[in-house]
From Swiss-Prot:
UniProt-recorded name of the protein: Aldehyde dehydrogenase family 3 member A2
Mutagenesis or variant effect for G185A: In SLS; severe loss of activity
Consequence the record notes for mutating L106R: In SLS; severe loss of activity
SUPFAM superfamilies: ALDH-like (SSF53720)
Catalytic activity: an aldehyde + NAD(+) + H2O = a carboxylate + NADH + 2 H(+); a fatty aldehyde + NAD(+) + H2O = a fatty acid + NADH + 2 H(+); (2E)-hexadecenal + NAD(+) + H2O = (E)-hexadec-2-enoate + NADH + 2 H(+); hexadecanoate + NADH + 2 H(+) = hexadecanal + NAD(+) + H2O
Activity at various pH: Optimum pH is 9.8.
Result, substituting R228C: In SLS; severe loss of activity
Assembly, per entry: Homodimer.
Compartment(s): Microsome membrane; Endoplasmic reticulum membrane
Effect of substituting P121L: In SLS; severe loss of activity
């Protein structure tokens, strides 16, 4: 591992990842890979998650292509140095912010969307001019293998490498020094990544998860609400970090919600859900058994059917769920949807705030003020009102968590910023040295007073014009005098 990281760092230090033209070429090559090897990519992901190729394309591939196009369109502007506002003492100097690549980045991908959650941060790292080591999840082994095969065929083989393996390989990687680590996965491993990064003072982006609540107000269209929740919850068999984890609603709505979700499930997946090409499977037996354990002692309103041999768990809804039970103590990450009755929106807000900050919050209501209130009085990584998941699709939004649901953000410009150092640059002249006497010893009260005048914004707007004229006269006199020094 050490030799691999050293090799990538030497490639970065050569400087060839920095020019804008090179970055654009690599992004175009990545897009070409996705387009030319689409069939191979679709087949690998489908094998890992029992996904239809249509779902793979719509949930992963199209997002990657859209992100690449967005980067190609905007990158020339983003890499340009940006001038900043100056104060009186620097008004004749050149001041700007220059984005610079961080260096060698480690990206640790996730298994639930193994292509997009690995490639999307890679796009940002390439756009920012970094070298990258990619560590796909070993749980989605087919996707990991296809990435290791294809990426070297299209990208610079010294700057961007794939390292496959399990816990042992990841542990060894984390012992190495990186300039940024980007991890997508669960909170427990996120803490391990952060601890390892701290030894080298390496900054991290942690895309984690949590229990994303979904509040349903009585003032809403339940038919539409339940269709949207059903889509977001059971997509990818519930293995989505921003899936609605549980529902909060008044008790009077509970039976209607159950019935409408049940009917929607039938509409989406047919009478025999197990045979539907649009319904996926749990990634492995360990996660299958973990999810089953969450059903113990619960009231199953519908669903609950399982098949260990194929890792099938039917779309399931639980009612009258006790907040103290196991299913409400950990992220479900599966096709189980608990309903927790609350008296009103006040109790819902308190319920959310008493728990760890989630990755997403969903609120359904015709009452716009109620939605705004829940946004104002809670905290989460992101919010979608009257829908679920959809804020992820807007690449002008930063996507990321807060608190235990993660730190840092990416997508679009936010990815570029995550993998860049915003370097402040001030270029002064060696002339006009007389004007600098104000800051040189020996110090005096008059210098302090002049410093206040130049640097502190204490002007009354009504007197601003007169003060500005006076100030310009003083500056002109100082500059004229300085020319004789």
């Amino acid at each position: 591992m050490e030799l691999e990281v050293r090799r990538v760092r030497q490639a970065f230090l050569s400087g060839r990842s920095r020019p804008l033209r090179f970055r654009l070429q690599q992004l175009e090559a990545l897009r070409r890979m996705v387009q030319e090897r689409e069939k191979d990519i679709l087949t690998a992901i489908a094998a890992d998650l029992c996904k239809s190729e249509f779902n793979v394309y719509s949930q992963e591939v199209i997002t990657v292509l859209g992100e690449i196009d967005f980067m190609l369109e905007n990158l020339p502007e983003w890499v340009t140095a940006k001038p900043v506002k100056k104060n009186v003492l620097t008004m004749l100097d050149e001041a700007y912010i220059q984005p610079q690549p961080l260096g060698v980045v480690l990206i640790i991908g996730a298994w639930n969307y193994p292509f997009v959650l690995t490639i999307q941060p890679l796009i940002g790292a390439i756009a920012a001019g970094n070298a990258v080591i990619i560590k796909p999840s070993e749980l989605s082994e087919n996707t990991a293998k296809i990435l290791a095969k294809l990426l070297p065929q299209y990208l610079d083989q010294d700057l961007y490498i794939v390292i496959n393996g399990g816990v042992e390989e990841t542990t060894e990687l984390l012992k190495q020094r990186f300039d940024h680590i980007f991890y997508t996965g669960n909170t427990a491993v996120g803490k391990i990544v952060m601890e390892a990064a701290a030894k080298h003072l390496t900054p991290v982006t942690l895309e984690l998860g949590g229990k994303s609540p979904c509040y349903i107000d009585k003032d809403c269209d339940l038919d539409i609400v339940c269709r949207r929740i059903t889509w977001g919850k059971y997509m990818n068999c519930g293995q989505t970090c921003i899936a609605p984890d549980y529902i909060l609603c008044e008790a009077s709505l509970q039976n209607q919600i159950v019935w409408k979700i049940k009917e929607t499930v039938k509409e989406f997946y047919g009478e025999n859900i197990k045979e539907s090409p649009d319904y996926e499977r749990i990634i492995n037996l360990r996660h299958f058994k973990r999810i089953l354990s969450l059903l113990e002692g619960q009231k199953i309103a519908f669903g609950g059917e399982t098949d260990e041999a194929t890792r099938y768990i039917a779309p399931t809804v639980l009612t009258d769920v006790d907040p103290k039970t196991k299913v409400m103590q950990e992220e479900i990450f599966g096709p189980i949807l608990p309903i927790v009755p609350v008296k009103n929106v006040d109790e819902a807000i308190n319920f959310i705030n008493e728990r760890e900050k989630p990755l997403a919050l969903y609120v359904f209501s015709h009452n716009h003020k109620l939605i705004k209130r829940m946004i104002d009085e809670t905290s989460s990584g992101g919010v979608t009102g009257n829908d679920v998941i959809m804020h992820f699709t807007l690449n002008s939004f930063p996507f990321g968590g807060v608190g235990s649901s993660g730190m840092g953000a990416y997508h679009g410009k936010h990815s570029f910023d995550t993998f860049s150092h915003q370097r402040p640059c001030l270029l002064k002249s060696l002339k006009r040295e007389g004007a600098n006497k104000l800051r040189y010893p020996p110090n005096s009260q008059s210098k302090v007073d002049w410093g206040k005048f130049f640097l502190l914004k204490r002007f009354n707007k009504e007197k601003l014009g007169l003060l500005l004229l006076t100030f310009l006269g003083i500056v002109a006199a100082v500059l004229v005098k300085a020319e004789y020094y």
